[in-house]
Amino acid sequence: MATIGRRAYAEMYGPTVGDRVRLADTELVIEVEADYTLRAGGYGEEVKFGGGKVIRDGMGQSQRPNGPGPHDAVDCVVTNALILDHWGIVKADIGLRGQRIAAIGKAGNPDVQPGIDIVIGPGTEVIAGEGLIVTAGGIDCHIHFICPQQIEEALSSGVTTMLGGGTGPATGTFATTCTPGPENIANMLRAADAFPMNLGFFGKGNASRPEALRQQVEAGVIGLKLHEDWGTTPAAIDCCLSVADEGDVQVAIHSDTLNESGFVEDTIGATKGRTLCAFHTEGAGGGHAPDILRVVGEANFLPSSTNPTMPYTVNTLDEHVDMLMVCHHLDAAIAEDLAFAESRIRRETIAAEDILHDLGAISMFSSDSQAMGRVGEVVLRCWQTAHKMKVQRGKLPGDPERHDNGRAKRYVAKYTINPAIAHGVSHEVGSIEVGKWADLVFWRPAFFGVKPSLVMKGGFIASALMGDANASIPTPQPVHYRPMFGAFGGALTRGSLSFVSQAALASEVGSVYGLRKPLSAVKQCRTVKKGDMVHNAYLPRMEVDAQTYQVRADGQLLTCEPATALPMTQRYFLF
C-alpha cells in the first residue's frame, strides 16, 4: 500500500491523531485526540474538493438528492476540520442540513466508500476545513447594547450570540445591562431582526414588588438584571429571584459596591440558595468591595468576569479609574465619586481573578461592551489569559508535557457552553453537537483567537475576510471583514435566533411584534448550579482580607505578577 509522510498528510488533509497544533503565537499547544474521518477503515478514503481531487461525480460525490434523512445528501459539508470544543479535540467532517448540524463524522459517497455517515451529493456545498480549527460560535453574556455597530464587531471576532440589555446610547444603558419595560423590549426584539446574530435581552430586575418584573418576562426578556446603580438591595434580590422562578428565566446580578444596603453575606443570604449569574465576580468590575470574589465558593452563584482586567498586565490599573468614571456617570471633581471608583480597583483581587479562571473557579468570560469592556476581544483575551497562566503557573494537572488539551477545553468552555447552560440556551447553541444551530467559526491556527477566516450563522456564511471585490481572485491583500450573503435579506432572518421567555413564546409575541426571526425560549435556567459548569465547576472556600485585599482559595494565596508582554497583540494589529 502506498504511504505518505505525516507532514505531507497534514498539509494536504489537515492534522490527524497525534499531531499537535500551536494556537496563534501563544505557548498553548493542542493535540488531535481522535480522527472521525478514519471511520471508512483507515487512511485513504479522505474527501477533498478541487481540481483532480475526490469530491467529483461518481467518486466522493454520490447521486443522492438532498433531504431530511440520514441517507440523504446534506446541504453543506465541512471537510477534514479540527474541532476544538469542550467535549474534545477531534478531526472530523461536519454535515450541515438547514440551519443545524446534521452529523459529525465521515463524509463521502456511500455507494463507493465504506463507513460514510455524511452523504455528499450534487446539492452539497463544500467548505474546505483542511488545516483549519473550527469552534462553536462564542457567546457573550454581558452586553450593554449601546450601539448596533457592536454586533458586526463581535461577529468578526467569532461571537455569534449576544445576551444583555439596553436601548442604545441612553444613560441607563451606559451603566447597566437592562432593557426596561415592555415597549423597549418589543423595540429591541424588532431591531434584532436586522442583525446576523442570536440575541436575547435582560429586563430590569430592581424592584421590591413583582408586578413590573412579571410584565417584562411576559414581554420577552430571557432574564432580569439586578444592578447596583438601580439599587441591588436584599429586598430587590429576593423579589427578582421569586419572579424568575415563576417564569424560568435567569437572574444576573451586579451587587452593591458601596455595601450600603448590606455586605456580601447579606446578598448571599437574600438569594436563599436560588440560582443567579454573578456578573463581575472579579477584581475591579464592581460588586461588594473588596470581597465579591467570595461568591466563587457558593454553589448557586454562576460566576463570570469581564475582559478589561483579563489578563492582568502592567497597564491594567492605569486605564481603569478613568474608564469607570465615564461608564458609571461619576464626576472626578466629587471626592465621594472618586473614592467610589478607587474602591473598585484593587491589584490583589485583579491578580487573583486570573488564577481563579485557571483553576476553573470562575466559569464564564464576557465583555461588558463599551461599559468597561471590549466587545471584540472576548475570545482574544480569554486565550491570552490561558497563555499567561501556563507561563506563570505551568501545566494544569492532567495535561502531559506534549499538549494543553485540558486547559484548552477549560478556556473554550468559558465563552461557549457555560454561558449557554447558565442562560438556558444550551439546547440551541454553545457547542458543536448534532442537532444544534450551525454557528461555526473557522480559524487558521496562526490566527486562532485573533482573526477568524470565516463565520457561519445557521449553516450559512455571514462574515468573512475578503479582498478587493473587483479583483480576479478572492484573496488579494489587504483583506478585511465584510458581511456575506448570510447577513442579508431572508437568509439573515432564517440564520439567527431571538431568544425569549417561555411565557412570551406561548403568547406569540413574534406575531404581536411583527418579528421575522425564529424565536427560541430559554429553559432550565432555575435548576442549573455551579456544578453544571463544564470544566469550570471548582467550588473553593474563599477568603478575602478586607485590609490587605489578599485572596485565598482553600487556604492557598492567589497572587501573580502582571504581564509585561502578551501574545496575540502587535504581531496581528496595526493599531
UniProtKB/Swiss-Prot annotation:
Pathway: Nitrogen metabolism; urea degradation; CO(2) and NH(3) from urea (urease route): step 1/1
Gene Ontology terms describing biological process: urea catabolic process
Residues binding Ni(2+) 1, per UniProt: 142, 144, 225, 368
Modification sites for N6-carboxylysine: 225
EC number per UniProt: 3.5.1.5
Taxonomy, superkingdom: Bacteria
Any matching Pfam family: Urease_alpha
Record PTM: Carboxylation allows a single lysine to coordinate two nickel ions.
Active-site positions on this chain: 328 (proton donor)
Subcellular location: Cytoplasm
Reaction catalyzed: urea + 2 H2O + H(+) = hydrogencarbonate + 2 NH4(+)
Entry-linked CDD domains: Urease_alpha
Single GO MF annotation: nickel cation binding
Cofactor(s) needed for function: Ni cation
Subunit structure: Heterotrimer of UreA (gamma), UreB (beta) and UreC (alpha) subunits. Three heterotrimers associate to form the active enzyme.
Protein family (similarity comment): Belongs to the metallo-dependent hydrolases superfamily. Urease alpha subunit family.
Name recorded for this polypeptide: Urease subunit alpha
Classification lineage: Bacteria, Pseudomonadati, Pseudomonadota, Betaproteobacteria, Burkholderiales
